[in-house]
């Protein structure tokens, strides 16, 4: 299975609008029992989340996993920092890339792969407002060109 495929449970839809995605990496997430049940129920939000590297370990921060309804006392803090499972050389590569100015790690999507929860992390650089407007303009122009070509080909 290729990266990013599987049963997609959550996506950060504005990520490609707000950031230039340079590279993506698949990582496992360390979750508690009730958290994985909430993730399987697609009760996860990636909107404000980001990843960081501390002491040679990757961590997922500000990702909200809603408490499992039947979990009562076993529920963990919905906003807790969760460890990401990556190989040492992947972590080192990402740490080296993050030293560049304006680079950050953002979660793009969460999905199940062979029964395990995985997160697709994107190495990204923030876009300026004029970049966002330019990409919208380019997308609309491409759409208009395709529409015209489609009508020409029908004749």
Swiss-Prot record:
Domain of life, per lineage: Bacteria
Signal peptide residues on this chain, from the entry's feature table: none
GO function term, MF aspect, one: RNA binding
Alphabetical list of Pfam families matching this protein: SmpB (PF01668)
Subcellular location: Cytoplasm
Matching CDD domains: SmpB
One of the record's GO cellular component terms: cytosol
Gene Ontology terms: biological process: trans-translation
Major localization listed first in the record, in broad terms: cytoplasm
Keywords: Cytoplasm, RNA-binding
Record NCBIfam families: PRK05422.1, smpB
Family, similarity comment: Belongs to the SmpB family.
PANTHER family: SSRA-BINDING PROTEIN, TMRNA-BINDING COMPONENT OF TRANS-TRANSLATION TAGGING COMPLEX
The protein's role, per its UniProt record: Required for rescue of stalled ribosomes mediated by trans-translation. Binds to transfer-messenger RNA (tmRNA), required for stable association of tmRNA with ribosomes. tmRNA and SmpB together mimic tRNA shape, replacing the anticodon stem-loop with SmpB. tmRNA is encoded by the ssrA gene; the 2 termini fold to resemble tRNA(Ala) and it encodes a 'tag peptide', a short internal open reading frame. During trans-translation Ala-aminoacylated tmRNA acts like a tRNA, entering the A-site of stalled ribosomes, displacing the stalled mRNA.
Protein name: SsrA-binding protein
Protein source organism: Streptococcus equi subsp. equi (strain 4047)
């Amino acid at each position: 299975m290729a990266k990013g495929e599987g049963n997609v449970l959550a996506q950060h839809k504005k990520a490609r609008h707000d950031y230039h995605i340079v590279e993506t990496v698949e990582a496992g997430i360390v979750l508690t029992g009730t958290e994985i049940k909430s993730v399987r129920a697609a009760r996860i939000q990636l909107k404000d989340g980001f990843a960081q590297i501390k002491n040679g370990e990757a961590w997922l921060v500000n990702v909200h996993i809603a408490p499992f309804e039947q979990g009562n006392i076993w529920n963990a803090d919905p906003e807790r920092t969760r460890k990401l499972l990556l190989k040492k050389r992947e972590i080192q590569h990402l740490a080296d890339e993050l030293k560049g100015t304006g680079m950050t790690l953002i979660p793009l999507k969460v999905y199940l792969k062979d029964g395990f929860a995985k997160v697709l992390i994107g190495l990204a650089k923030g876009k300026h407002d004029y970049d966002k407007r330019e990409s919208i303009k380019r997308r609309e122009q491409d759409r208009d060109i395709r529409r015209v070509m489609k009508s020409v080909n029908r004749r």
